Amino acid sequence: MATVKLVPNPEPKKDANPAQVKFYQTCIGMAMWLMLGTRPDIAFAVGKLARFSSNPSQDHLNALKRLFDYICWSADFGLRFIKQDNPEFPICHVDADFAGDPSDRISVTGYVFMSFGTPFSWSSKKQPVVATSTAEAEYTAMFYASQQAFWIRQFSQEIGFPFTKPLEIFSDSQATLSIASGTHTHGKTKHLDVKLHKIREYVNTKHINLNFIRGEDNKADILTKPLAHKQFHKAVEWFSFSVDGYPDSPPDPGNSAEEQEVSSQLLEEDS
């Protein structure tokens, strides 16, 4: 997906026929169901492709086929929660891709909560408004991650497992951490006032604790943008998907029976 360039179809031209649109939307729905349940590794790709559901072009269908090639190849992947004598306390990694979409320059929020070394809650979504700086995009992402952290704490308490310490949130943005801690506040951040005080409230009430992490170690990076081959493999290994380890590379598209079936369906709908 890193090399696939997707742009909206110019209006009012309609390249896709109704059968293609229906097939595309059905496939996106299936991929989204899988992504929400057990596959954070495809979250960004699914979100990106879903933006073109109303009028997919052949480029979008080709990218969708590539996504399903990967899904078929990694069908045995799954989340593994390994029993530990000293269970790991949940942590969160949060990241943002600033103005990554050239069509509207809206940034993407990505966060992942992990326990026992395995994800259990994640999100990859476009932000509601255009951020005017990297710090603003990262801070908006941290705001949504902190809201989810608060909900996780409340849910855990309701089922009888209250947290005994703040939930740790890791970000690779020093500017964002400075804003959240109150050491970097001036006129340029005034419009972030509501989010600013809500995150500080969570910190002051010991619901969350904010930490810095290097960008190359941020596990939420895969949720915000397409990654190069090596980086993508590293991120998937972080998520503890495969019992036997992550292979060097996926097979050529169309090698398996499942992939051939997906390919033939796409070709039939296109004809």
Question: Would you name each region that the model predicts?
Answer:
Residues M1-G78, R214:
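C-terminal reverse transcriptase regions that engage the nucleic-acid substrate
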Residues T3, M32, D76, P90-I91, ...:
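Beta-strand-rich binding-surface signature
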Residues R66, H93-P102, A220, T224-L227:
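Acidic, metal-ion-coordinating active-site neighborhood of RNase H-like domains
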Residues A19-F44, D97-G100, V108, A135-Q154:
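Conserved pre-motif C helix in the palm subdomain of viral-like polymerases
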Residues A31, C92-A135:
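RNase H-like nuclease fold core
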Residues R39, D95, I169-D172:
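Retroviral integrase
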Residues F52, P87-F89, K125-S271:
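RNase H-like nuclease module associated with reverse transcription
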Residues D69-V94, F163:
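Structured nucleic-acid-interacting core domains from mobile-element enzymes and related host factors
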